[in-house]
Amino acid sequence: MTRPLAILARIANDVQLMFRRPPRQQYAALCYRVRKKTGELEMLLLTSRDTGRWVIPKGWPMPGKLSHEVAAREAFEEAGVRGTVETEPLGAFSYDKVLKDGIQVPCRVQVYALDVNDLAKNFKEKGERTVEWVSCSEAIKRVREPELRDIILAFERRMTARFAAAEAK
């Protein structure tokens, strides 16, 4: 009796795989700054407009823009920050975006580090989100996506090593 159930389970799984859409690509900025007085590394988090969960600025590809340029543009539009964006991604994470019609779309997000050096008073989505600077440990607690937590942790370790090397000179 278990054999027919196993076959049915396999068929159901195969059908799901056939109809699953490939993930849609997005680009994000892991915005950071180093406090001048304390030397503390801080991350910028903001709330999503739909669910209010803590996220980093991200968006869809834009015609004529490279992926890291899209990440920087989204950081400005969503949080009003400008800075120097790295051209190589730190990594990627996955999540399911719920569209306005309720459909869930799997997304794969490439993340680029952005060293913030300017905060704008006016920007496109001002007032639509809560924006906060937090420690790396707080950022890891607030974001939901495990892969994004790993990216933040790895970035913190990279920056800590960079600070230690600079102090050793």
Stretches found by the model and what they are:
Residues 1-36:
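Acidic, metal-coordinating catalytic segment for phosphate/diphosphate chemistry
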Residues 10, 143-169:
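Charged phosphate-binding loop/patch that engages nucleotide di/tri-phosphates or the phosphate backbone
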Residues 34-38, 49-53, 62, 95, ...:
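Short, charged/polar surface micro-motifs in flexible loops or helix N-caps
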Residues 35-42, 101-104:
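Short, solvent-exposed loop/turn segments that connect beta-strands within catalytic domains
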Residues 44-47:
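Short, acidic/hydrophobic/Gly-rich beta-strand patch recurrent on exposed beta strands
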Residues 56-58:
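Thr-Gly-centered strand-to-loop micro-motif
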Residues 62-150:
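Unchanged
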